[in-house]
Amino acid sequence: MKVAIALTDQSFQRTKSMGIFNVSMGLAKGLMNCPEVTELHILGNNECGDAFKDCPPHVHVHLTDKPVPRRFARVWWDQFGLCAAVRKIKPDWVILPKGVPPFFPRFGKAKMACYVHDVMWEHYEQRSAADRKGPFPWHELLYFRNLSLRAMKISDLVLTHTQFNASRILHYVPQARIARIGIGYDDTPPAPETDSPKRDVLTYASTFPHKCTPLTLQRISAWLNTREDGKDIRIHVVGSMPEELALPNAGWIHHARIPYAELRTLLREKCRMAVYFSDYESYGMPPVECLLNGVPCVASDIPPIRENIPAQYLFNNADEADFIAKANAAYDKKSPFICPEFPTWQEVCNRCVQAMLQH
């Protein structure tokens, strides 16, 4: 089977979703080792192309001399450039890991598989206008809403991860052909620590309103105030801070976007617990990454997170006492550490290939 996968719009520095970036890269790397894929064409750029050096002979990387498309160039690539590139390759299947298909041009005879990560536009349409402000201009939200619905309707195969997200796709397009292939991880959890000297806590920040950064700072501050050792606990905040917010004091350490290898080191060497607040997720990768690095992560109790994270780590966003109780239990190791089993990227890509072969 001859497969093309489009990564030209992927950038670690510029992406608004690290989850989508990680899934895109994981799929491309995993497909290399699927025996059914006899020829793999990766449409890359001069940033993500660096991750695909020294590939096997059946893997071909294209367009690595081009920059990541942005704004109008991104729209032009989505609608015309991608189609032209795919028609030259003439694959059996083209995979769009960002889930953004063109409106009109076709890929020749190639079948199309779109990875639909979320229905986030649905969530933002339901928020009040005052609460909707964020990195989504109205025209961008409308553009991706329409392309997301088109992906659900015209894809020969819709790839996704959680049962929650699959149910939202079927709500809008009951006839969608869905393969729930999941998300892969290649980390092996370290041995459980019974008496860890680590004291730090890791949490996340974002300019996206649904990531609840103000609530995150408020709840963690309240938790610290209840503990005798609260002044000795450092809080690592990973991600982009909203402009109107400042960290409470010098005990809070801000990290901008960091590579996963650096995050992994931070978790394994310094952190005793992680905290993840969110109003909306389609999956929720950060809590899983924390567990796979041996760090309990207390997280918002919403349906997609509930599919992957043990109940002992879940709290009600609206209940401060519940958060404090769950945080204390995790930090003080009152219950045995639990890390469910998660598929590797190779297993996820095998599922993807089998689904394509069946269609």
Question: How would you name each of these model-derived features?
Answer:
Residues 1-359:
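Carbohydrate transferase catalytic cores enriched for Leloir-type hexosyltransferases
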